[in-house]
Amino acid sequence: MSKPFHCIYAHGFIRAAVCVPFVRVADPAYNVERTLGLARRASERQAAIALFPELGLSAYSNEDLFHQDALLDASEAAVVQLIESSRELYPLLLVGAPVRFEGKLFNCALTLYQGQLLGITPKSYLPNYREFYEKRQFTAGRLAVGRELTYAGQRVPFGTDLVYQARNIPDFALHTEICEDLWTPVPPSTYAALAGATVLANLSASNITIGKAEYRRDLCAAQSGRCIAAYLYSAAGPGESTTDLAWDGQALIYENNELLAESQRFAADEQIITADIDLERLAQDRMRLTSFNDAVGEHREQLRQFRRVEFDFRIPSDARTLLRRVERFPFVPNDPAKRDERCFEAYHIQVHGLAKRLQSTGIHKLVIGVSGGLDSTQALIVAARTMDNLGLPRQNILAYTLPGYATSAVTLNNAHGLMRALGVSAREIDIRPSCLQMFRDLDHPFARGEPVYDVTFENVQAGERTSHLFRLANHHNALVLGTGDLSELALGWSTYGVGDHMSHYNVNASVPKTLIQRLLRWIIASRQFDAQCSDILQSILDTEISPELVPSQAGTAQDKPTQSTQEVIGPYALQDFNLYYVTRHGFRPSKVAFLSHHAWGDKSRGDWPDSLPSDKHTEYDLATIKRWLGVFLFRFFQISQFKRSCVPNAPKVGSGGSLSPRGDWRAPSDAAATVWLEELRRGVPD
C-alpha cells in the first residue's frame, strides 16, 4: 500500500506535545478538566504523545495531604474520568498521579491511550535532601513486589521496566521516568533506551531556583544525546503552592542533543509546545553506532527484564505540515555564531591537515592549479595560511593558471588577481598547444578544425592540466595540492586518474560546495586576508560555476563562462541537501524528497543565511526536487563509486562529510541504483 507522501507519519516522524497545565493544589476534579483541555489541543495538532507534569492530577505540592484517602480517591476518580473522556483523542497521555499499591504510596506516571490504561511506572529515585522530603510520603518504585495491579477499574502492568511499543510504527517505543530519575548517575531511561525505547518522557515537578533551568536543559540534552533518543520534559507550572517554593513550568523537547522546542517560563497560564521527532533518524544513528549496541550486549540480562506493552496507534492522516526546522543548507548552520564557529573549525582542519602532510614528507613546496573557481580558490587560501603557520614563504606555493579552449576572461583575471594578492609564485601555462598535439595523436575531429566538443575534448584538457601539475611537482620537489570538493566527489564530477580526481593531498575532499561558498564569505567577513584579496574572493563567489571546457562558439571571445555545471548535474544546494540525508542518515529517497520540499518548496518560509544575497534565495517545486534527486541517486550509487574507491588522502572535516573508502564510506564500485530509483518513483508523486 502506498503511503500518503505529505503526511509526516509516513516518513518516520511522530508529533510530540509537552503540556504545562494550570493546577489547583489538592483538587483533582479541577486538574483533570485542565488536563483534558490540553489533551484535546494536542489531539487537534495530531500529536502522538501528550506529556504532563509529575503528579499533575493532584498537584505536586500537597506534602502530607498525600496521606489523605479523600485526595487519593479523588485522584483515582480523575484518572477514570480522563480514561473515559480521551477515547477519541489521538495522543498517548502521560499523566502523573499518586497510586496506592501493596500498602504503599507511589509517585507514578500513567500511560493512557484511547480508553485504556496501558501501564503505570513508579518513580525510581525519591529526593530527600534540601527542600525535598518525598520519602516522607512515597515509596521508591524498586520496593514494589508485584508487577500488576488493578487501578481505575483496569488490570495493568506496574513497574519501572515498561516500554510502550506501537505495533504499526516499529521505531515508536516509549518509556517514562519521573523528575529526580534524570538527576541520578544512571537514569532508568538509560536502560530503557538500551532496551529499545526511542522516546524518553520525564514527568517532572522540579521547583525553580536561580540557574536551574539551564541545568535542566543540560541534563535533557545530554540524556537525549547519550541515549540517541528523543527526550520530553515537563516541569510543574502555575498553580502549585508557593508556600516555600516557586515553579516556572519549563517544558522541553530534545532529539539526540538538539533542542526542538521549549516553553515560555513563568507563564501565567497553561502552555503546550509541540515538535516533530524523527524516529528513523534515531534508529539509523543507533544502528551505525557500534558502541551503543556494545552497551546493549553488556547489559543484556538486565534489558531482557523489560516488558513490552504493545498498542495499535491510530495515525493522524491530516498531519501534513512538518513542525520542525529543516535547514536548506545542512552543512551550513543558519545561526551566525554556529556558522562562524563551523567555518573557523573547517578552515583550520584543512590547514592543520596540510601542515602535517608537509611536515611528515619533509617537502616545503606546493603545486596548485588555480582556475579562478571556488574550489581552487579555497585550496589556495588554505595553502597560504599553512605556509604562514609553518613559517615558510608563500612563494613556496607554485600556483599555475592553465587556460584552455573555454577559459573565460573573468575567471582568468580572478586567478591572476588572487595569486598576486596572496603573494604566491604565479605563472600561466597555455595548455592549448599540448592539447592540440594530443588531439592529433588521437585523430580527434577537433584537430582537423571540426567543432566536436565531446567528452574526449573535455577530458584531454582536464588531463593535460593535471599532467602538467604532477610533472611540475616532480621538477620542483613539491606536492600537488588537490582542489576537488565533496559535492563533486559524490556526483562523480571529475576526470578520473590523470585529471582533477588525482593529487598528492586534497584539502577540499570533505568540504561540500555549499560550505566552500560559505567559507569564502566567512574569510571575507572575518578579514583573514587584505581588502584586495577579499574583493577578488567576492568576484569569484559571483561567478557562475563552470568546468570551462567547451567554448561557446569557435573564434568567439568568452568574457564569462558559457558552461553551467548546475544545468547538467543539478543545483549544488539541492544536491548537497541530498548528499547529507542519503549518506549521513541513510534515508530512503521519498523521505529525502519530503524534507527537501519542506526546506526548498517556499522561499518565503524559514530562515536564510544572512550573508546570502536575496537574489540567491530560490525555491523548487516537488517535480524539480524529484528530478534532481533522481540524477543524484543514479550518479552516486551507480556510476561514480569507482572514483571514490581510490581517492587521495584528505582530512575529514564534518560529521556528514567524508566519502573516503578509508573513512565514512565503503561501497562497491559496481552496485546498481535500481532500488533507490524505484523507491523514488513509487514514493514521490509527480
Regions found by a protein language model. Give the residues of each.
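ATP/NTP-dependent adenylation/nucleotidyl-transfer catalytic domains that generate, transfer
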Residues: 14-15, 170-172, 227-229, 238-241, ...
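Enzyme catalytic cores with a strong preference for nitrogen-chemistry domains
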Residues: 1-369, 381, 385-394, 426
